[in-house]
Regions:
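Alpha-helix N-cap and loop-to-helix initiation/capping positions
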Residues: 59-63, 96-103
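Flexible, glycine/charged-enriched surface loops at secondary-structure junctions
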Residues: 77-82, 118-120
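Phosphate/ribose-phosphate-bearing ligand recognition and processing surfaces
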Residues: 93-98, 111
Length: 146
């Protein structure tokens, strides 16, 4: 799993182009969960996350704990409790299945919320128009190979 985390004063997105089929997107949105096509977040950790095939071998619980702990650590270093998960499958050639990726993202979001963090996800299966304001200090950008 590769993770590029930014502390962002402001992170806004809007869906631009759907890049997966409706059936593939449905894996991320079970039941009637609605896709939020546009949102703005402030004072948050924005995590660009790439789940790799090897992560499936390590298991969901292991990967969930590792990623959640990493994100909480970065959040504490930046004095925020708001964390935004963004699927970014451009950090490695290896890719996990969509099903595993969806399960992991939902599990991490739930774990963060259970730990009193404000957690959410950008829309999965879309290219997004992004607008990001990130300050220029060391802990505002953290790379992780988890």
């Amino acid at each position: 799993m590769k993770v590029l985390v930014f502390y962002t004063r402001r992170f806004a997105y809007k869906t631009a182009e759907q890049n997966l089929s409706d059936e593939e997107i449905a894996l991320f949105y079970p039941g009637s969960k609605e896709i939020v096509h546009e949102a703005e977040h402030t004072n948050c950790i924005t995590a660009f996350i790439h789940i790799e095939a090897e992560d499936e071998e390590k298991g969901l619980k292991s990967r969930e704990k590792k990623l959640a702990n990493h994100l909480k650590w970065v959040a504490r270093k930046n004095n925020t409790s708001s964390i935004l998960l963004h699927s970014f499958a451009h950090l490695s050639a290896s890719k996990a299945s969509l099903k595993f990726t969806a399960e992991l993202f939902h599990a991490v979001e739930a774990r963060l919320k259970n730990g009193n963090y404000e957690a959410s996800q950008t829309p999965f299966g879309f290219f997004l128009d992004l607008n990001m304001e990130a300050p220029g200090y060391s802990m505002a950008r953290v790379w992780g190979d988890l």
